[in-house]
Amino acid sequence: MILARIVGTVVATRKDPRLVSSKLLVARPVDPHGKAEGSYLVAVDTVDAGFGETVLIVSGSSARMASGLKDCPVDAAIVGIVDTVQVSEPGT
């Protein structure tokens, strides 16, 4: 799973017919402390996430299994909205 923050939306007037009712969001991976890291990615929203929210994203075949997207051309799907992240660092 990828921890990420929603930073934008994607509008596609023409797309695969199986994605017509799907919302596409731009996400930026973050570390457990919320610091941005890695490249942006586009993911199908299955949980009605909003701008600025921290989310959980699955990719690959797991993304296609999320919320009935099995036969869709999807590589990343948002499957959870994160309320909090707690990290216990060694030595603290």
Task: Name every feature range the model reports, one short phrase each.
Residues 1-37:
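N-terminal first-folded block
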Residues 9, 13, 46, 81-84:
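Residue-level recognition of beta-strand microenvironments
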Residues 14-17, 44-46, 66-69:
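A generic local secondary-structure boundary/capping motif
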Residues 30, 44-46, 60:
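A structural micro-motif recognizing beta-strand termini
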Residues 39-43:
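Short alpha-helix capping/helix-loop boundary micro-motifs
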Residues 56-92:
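C-terminal structural segments of small proteins and small subunits
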